[in-house]
Amino acid sequence: MMNLVLQYGLYILILVVLAIPLGNYIGKIMNGEKVFLSKILTPCENFIYKMLHIDKDEDMSWKKYSFSVLAFSIISLIVLFLIHIFQGFLPLNPEKVSGTSWDLAFNNAVSFVTNTNWQGYSGESSLSYFTQMMGLTVQNFVSAAVGISVLFALIRGFIRVKQKGIGNFWMDITRTVLYILIPLSIVVSLALVSQGVVQNFKQYETVSLLEPITLEDGTVVTEEVVPLGPAASQIAIKQLGTNGGGFMGTNSAHPIENPTVLSNLFEMISLLLIPVALCFTFGRNIKDRRQGIAIFIAMGIMLVVAMGIIGVNEQMGTPQMALNGQVDLSTINQAGGNMEGKEARFGIATSSTWATFTTAASNGSVNSMHDSYTPIGGMIPMLLMQLGEVVFGGVGCGLYGMIGFAILAVFMAGLMVGRTPEYLGKKIEPFEMKMAVLVCLATPIAILIGSGIASILPETVNSLNNSGAHGFSEVLYAYTSAGGNNGSAFAGFAANTPFINISIGLSMLFARFVPMMGTLAIAGSMVKKKKVAESVGTLPTHNAMFIGLLIFVVLLIGALSFFPALALGPIAEFFQMLG
């Protein structure tokens, strides 16, 4: 148990130490200030603007900014869909992989354009190097940049006074990719290659096993095919951009994607680095660092509590394991805990931490099988996604989602004291409240409607590997992952079917773009308003009371929306295990 506590403390410490300077750096990028990379990258930036005829002086209204986001995303979706369909005719396909089905192409295109990276396939057997590089990796960069750009627009809405424009989308996305995502990805890629993660264009290699394996049917296996490819470059941005889609089917549990404890540390820190840094960017750029720290603390408290619950439940295992003597918490030499579905080289503490990080952020990469966790250990990752991916969340979208909850919190506080609510010096009026509700409720709507329909269809029910409460949890987790733009899975049922591909694709689109449009509408409304001077009745939004209120509002909406569904799934399974 002490190992658990020490690892948790180390991960959080490293994150904060790296995130604070990165947050300041990102703040400079948002404002167009010079940074240490400016001499190298400014000529590249200006060349891109010139080549694409981008007007650097244009300041977009929220409607034009929204139109640009949607137009860019639609074009990205169409291009990625066509790459999947025609990959058999495209270069860099040494394994001669044919094109995917239209429904899988639609699902995967939506998945990567929305920064979800839900995968109903194994990358090493279904996709060519070209599709992985020019399709998925490109979207890993730009979908992350879209989320950060929308956050930039929202911050400008609060800091600008009596204006109409919230920034230039084309400049925001260009600067985000060029100055933030590419430099960080180069560093992480090189670190991963140093640990043995593959980065090449070779054909898959067939190697002889050290020891033959005899299968159940008597077949003796003496060789194994080792998948290769440009993995390190994709893995770096899949973590940094909170994308999560694995180069291999088993994601970061695969020894080629994540071979060592050190590579695991690099990938895990990369996972939450930018979402944590953006909290400090927020405080810096609104010129009140206390606001960013308050949101960071609120998110951090929920993250640490979730880490503790998952870690303890996995270390304690199930009642059945305790009866068999597999778990003994009374001695310093921990006997095991629930190691099912976990890599022996990582163990319970590291696997539990990753499960917390990946579902707190809208990442979805895994280094263990969440379906094999204990009922409560598996419920907490599900709940983190159901809260709206606001416990740090995805790059950009996590913070603007939490700001939506902050608006709800100050509105509730305003009702209690009979004052017009204010946030960051701007009045919160009916329009902002409507948009904030839209931002906060889009995820529950997408999850509950999708999982409800899927759970009553014979096609889905008949494909479940597990019946009862756990089978329902597998379906609920799938649509929770889609609605939370996460991408991880319990698996356990046939996911690559036309209905699942289309329904999950629609859930991902709804949960991505409805909150995004609501956020931009809030930015467009706020940017026109004047600042209101603080008074005795103004609710401070940087103290302990507000942090507690914000956590309460997030948990209240999550609990009210999902408790009935969780009661039918993981909670019911927990009580079944108690016997």
From Swiss-Prot:
Q: Which PANTHER family match?
A: POTASSIUM-TRANSPORTING ATPASE A CHAIN, POTASSIUM-TRANSPORTING ATPASE POTASSIUM-BINDING SUBUNIT
Subunit note: The system is composed of three essential subunits: KdpA, KdpB and KdpC.
Q: Which family does it belong to?
A: Belongs to the KdpA family.
Q: Which GO terms describe its cellular component?
A: plasma membrane
Biological role? Part of the high-affinity ATP-driven potassium transport (or Kdp) system, which catalyzes the hydrolysis of ATP coupled with the electrogenic transport of potassium into the cytoplasm. This subunit binds the extracellular potassium ions and delivers the ions to the membrane domain of KdpB through an intramembrane tunnel.
NCBIfam families, sorted:
kdpA
Q: What is this protein called?
A: Potassium-transporting ATPase potassium-binding subunit
According to its UniProt entry, this protein's organism is Clostridium botulinum (strain Alaska E43 / Type E3)
Nucleotide-binding among the record's keywords?
A: no
Q: What's its membrane topology?
A: Multi-pass membrane protein
Q: What keywords sit in the KW lines?
A: Cell membrane, Ion transport, Membrane, Potassium, Potassium transport, Transmembrane, Transmembrane helix, Transport
Name a GO molecular-function annotation.
potassium ion binding
TM segment ranges: 2-22, 66-86, 135-155, 177-197, 262-282, 292-312, 391-411, 437-457, 490-510, 546-566
Q: Please tell me whether the keyword Chaperone is annotated for this protein.
A: no
Origin organism lineage = Bacteria, Bacillati, Bacillota, Clostridia, Eubacteriales
Top-level taxonomic group: Bacteria
List the Pfam families hit by this protein, alphabetically.
KdpA
